[in-house]
From Swiss-Prot:
Belongs to the LpxK family. The keyword Transferase applies. PANTHER family: TETRAACYLDISACCHARIDE 4'-KINASE, TETRAACYLDISACCHARIDE 4'-KINASE, MITOCHONDRIAL-RELATED. ATP binds at residues 53-60. Pathway: Glycolipid biosynthesis; lipid IV(A) biosynthesis; lipid IV(A) from (3R)-3-hydroxytetradecanoyl-[acyl-carrier-protein] and UDP-N-acetyl-alpha-D-glucosamine: step 6/6. It is an enzyme of class 2 (transferase). One of its GO terms (molecular function) is tetraacyldisaccharide 4'-kinase activity. Pfam families: LpxK. Its EC number is 2.7.1.130. It catalyses: a lipid A disaccharide + ATP = a lipid IVA + ADP + H(+). The gene is lpxK. This is Tetraacyldisaccharide 4'-kinase.
Length: 325
């Protein structure tokens, strides 16, 4: 929504609805906190990775990074997710690297591929956790991909990911603005990760680093410096970020196309692209294109680099968990 990032007449028209949204969400949070509304406590610690605003903020790379950090500590980790974009007829659903993204959702399938840990999806987070623990009874920790505002699920740790480039938009709550909660919510979380340069709100800065491109058909890996004139597509929360990354790598983008986040792809959507030039896409998009990929299609995986004393302090909390399992 373009008007979320400015203050137009549409913004002011919707402001009363934003006040109603704030009133309802604040009351719900209070009722959960006081125990008037029932909430679920998982038998193992839960880490929620979420954000304050609608749209892509870089949560998935953070989840993948966090899984790997905890695995290095010897912990067995599982992931749960709402599974946005999933069209499964059965929930909860155990997502594996081989699950069809139409059924499992693009982000859960990507997480399963990159981490090899069990991923369960359901709008009911309790049901997702119960299925996950049936599959992996010795799980030490569960990471919830998104769900910061899902107060029905009790949590032990909270991480918020902020996109510096878009910030808080016009600063208003839904539907006048992009915010699900007010920025004051940041005062209660355990770690704030800024996607992009640091801001006054962030504890640490995250950089998404691309190293190479992988061919969707052959699996060949190639240096990004080998690519010069390319086409590119992106079906993520902020497509321009991907296009800018490629341009910063000295690539000339001869054709680009931005799709909606969690877009379901079909071969017909790609017929207008020049088949003689490489077509680059995100890894999240690639998992949905494997069944009809062409030999000139490549995806660019990224690794989250998150450093700093506050990260070390946060991760040190899980050393004690390891000692008790």
């Amino acid at each position: 929504m373009q008007f979320w990032y400015s203050r137009t007449w549409i913004t002011w028209l919707m402001l009363p609805l934003s006040f109603l949204f704030w009133l309802i969400s604040t009351c719900r949070q209070f009722l959960f906190r006081k125990g008037i509304f029932a909430s679920y406590r998982a038998p193992v610690p839960v880490i929620v990775v979420g954000n304050l605003s609608v749209g892509g903020n870089g949560k998935t790379p953070v989840v993948i990074w966090l899984v790997k950090q905890l695995q290095q500590k010897g912990l067995k980790v599982g992931v749960i997710s709402r599974g946005y974009g999933s069209q499964s007829s059965v929930y909860p659903l155990l997502v594996t690297p081989d699950t069809d993204p139409i059924q499992g959702g693009d982000e859960p399938v990507l997480i399963a591929k990159r981490t090899q840990v069990p991923v369960c999806i359901s709008a009911n987070r309790q049901h997702a956790i119960e299925l996950l623990l049936q599959h992996q009874p010795d799980c030490d920790l569960i990471i919830s991909d998104d769900g910061l505002q899902h107060y029905r699920l009790q949590r032990d740790f909270e991480i918020v990911v902020l996109d510096v480039q878009r910030g808080f938009g016009n600063g208003f709550l839904l539907p006048a603005g992009p915010l699900r909660e007010l920025p004051s919510r940041l005062n209660t979380v355990d770690l704030i990760i800024c996607h992009g340069q640091a801001s006054k709100y962030s504890d640490v800065e995250m950089t998404l680093v691309p190293h190479h491109a992988i061919n969707l058909v052959t699996g060949e890996s190639r240096l990004l410096s080998d690519f010069h004139r390319v086409s590119a597509i992106a079906g993520i929360g902020h497509p321009q970020r991907f296009f800018s990354m490629l341009e910063n790598l000295s690539m000339q983008l001869i054709q680009t196309k931005a799709f909606q986040d969690h877009q379901t792809f079909e071969a017909a959507q790609f017929v207008d692209f020049d088949q003689t030039q490489p077509l680059l896409m995100t890894e999240k998009d690639a998992v949905k294109c494997l069944s009809f990929a062409q030999k000139n299609w490549w995806y660019v995986p990224v690794e989250a680099e998150i450093k700093g004393e506050k990260v070390r302090s946060f991760l040190a909390k899980f050393d004690e968990i390891r000692k008790t399992v």
